[in-house]
Design a protein with these regions (language model features):
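Hydrophobic anchor at the beta1->P-loop junction of P-loop NTPases
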Residues: 15-17
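Mid-chain, well-packed structural core segment of small domains
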Residues: 53-86
Length: 121
């Protein structure tokens, strides 16, 4: 899975992460951070903070609590996105309201014994 993540990061600036709770969204972002020479031990889930920024290299957004398009503007998400080299967005609600291009969507479903991965390029 780590190698898949890195190959996608070479092609896309923005990776949208759509999957269940506890399926590994933040873990994948930690792998991505490691690839960018960011200490993966400092990468945390942004669920309650909306976003975590790691220098200008990586922006990690969780849109779980974004309830309206207005929330995107109120949180300055488009400005934040334009200031970072790579962006990982968990649960990308209202994605059409974000000023983004060059992205890929990774959907992961948890099964009792495995994870099912779909990549939408």
């Amino acid at each position: 899975m780590f190698n898949l993540w890195i190959e996608l990061a070479k092609k896309y600036k923005i990776i949208l992460l759509e999957w269940d709770l506890w399926a590994g969204k933040t873990l994948l972002t930690k792998w991505f951070a490691h690839w960018l020479w960011i200490n993966e031990n400092i990468v945390q889930s942004p669920t309650y903070a909306y976003l975590n920024s790691y220098d200008d290299k990586l922006l990690h957004i969780d849109m779980y609590r974004i309830n309206t398009e207005h929330d995107i503007w109120e949180k300055w998400l488009n400005d934040q996105i334009s200031n970072h080299e790579y962006i990982a967005i968990e649960r990308p609600n209202f994605i059409d309201s974000l000023d983004i291009s060059n992205y890929v969507t990774i959907k992961i479903q948890k099964d009792w014994e495995k994870r099912i991965v779909d990549i939408l390029e």
